Amino acid sequence: MDVMTLAAIPSPPQGVWYLGPLPIRAYAMCIIAGIIVAIWLTRKRYAARGGNPEVVLDAAIVAVPAGIIGGRIYHVITDNQKYFCETCDPVDALKITNGGLGIWGAVILGGLAVWAYFRYKKIPLAPFADAVAPGVILAQAIGRLGNWFNQELYGAETDVPWALEIYYRVDENGRFAPVTGVSTGEVIATVHPTFLYEMLWNLLIFGLLIWADRRFRLGHGRVFALYVAGYTLGRFWIEQMRTDEATMVFGMRINTLVSAVVFILAVIVFLRLGKGREAPAEVDPAYHAAQAERDDTETAGLDATTGTVPGDSPETTGKKRK
């Protein structure tokens, strides 16, 4: 065994466990963990901007199902040859455990669901988009760990020290099952861990968003535009390293082309959006007004309890009380 082999990154022996007849999929657990972290972080960021943190959970309730549906639709459209061929079963297109989700479909349909909810509640969307952006990219980073468990979305074979070992996995009947099976211990390839490259890139963009938002007090949707630009820039070069089957457009993998187009649009939007950040009262006017009214009521109640007459304190009258 050489040094390169010793330094290689091992894949997990399996990505699916069973609790009786119920499959526990590591990929799904990673996605759920990412969603929980994103909600937690967004609540803190949205409240700091002046918004109602309870709105974040409401938005997640509509965004997550829509995002899953949108992600699946995008995946099926861009990889339609896997589901609509002579030997394919079109029903497999409905099975999200077969092939996974596409991030752009999740962002688009999930974003539309949140937009509709905020429009219904008459709450400005831009401050929320800026609050949620770091949480989204962090959730994507966590979700990429699911690809590690599934032994998928990797690049060409390599002998670099950080190469990923791909194991031969089999099901209970001994048949080859790279995603749902259990490792035999046999290494069948060492490859570029492109999922890891994207995870690290996403963490880098997460740090950039947090820093830029604090340093420049970004608002009006600019944090979200920066997230889109940063993510697509990384996806553009990482996508070209992948070797899994993909739909080709103009000689490029379709996600490479989509990333290039979306990156350009995101940069244009970022440059055209207004500078500065919304005042807390602009983030959610109704919530801010309700908070101000509640504070006034509590102040009046405190004055009544202490016997202080509002507007008639020593500080306001300039007289000492004896």
Swiss-Prot record:
Protein's name in the database: Phosphatidylglycerol--prolipoprotein diacylglyceryl transferase
Gene Ontology terms for molecular function: phosphatidylglycerol-prolipoprotein diacylglyceryl transferase activity
InterPro entries per UniProt: Lgt (IPR001640), SMAD_FHA_dom_sf (IPR008984)
Topology versus the membrane: Multi-pass membrane protein
Membrane-spanning parts: 21-41, 50-70, 98-118, 123-143, 191-211, 254-274
GO biological process annotation, one example: lipoprotein biosynthetic process
Organism of derivation: Corynebacterium efficiens (strain DSM 44549 / YS-314 / AJ 12310 / JCM 11189 / NBRC 100395)
Function according to Swiss-Prot or TrEMBL: Catalyzes the transfer of the diacylglyceryl group from phosphatidylglycerol to the sulfhydryl group of the N-terminal cysteine of a prolipoprotein, the first step in the formation of mature lipoproteins.
Broadest EC class assigned to this enzyme: transferase
Protein family per UniProt: Belongs to the Lgt family.
Record-level GO cellular component terms: plasma membrane
Keyword terms of this UniProt record: Cell membrane, Membrane, Transferase, Transmembrane, Transmembrane helix
Binding site for a 1,2-diacyl-sn-glycero-3-phospho-(1'-sn-glycerol): 144
Pathway(s) the chain acts in: Protein modification; lipoprotein biosynthesis (diacylglyceryl transfer)
Record bears the keyword Lyase: no
PROSITE patterns from the UniProt entry: LGT
E.C. designation(s): 2.5.1.145
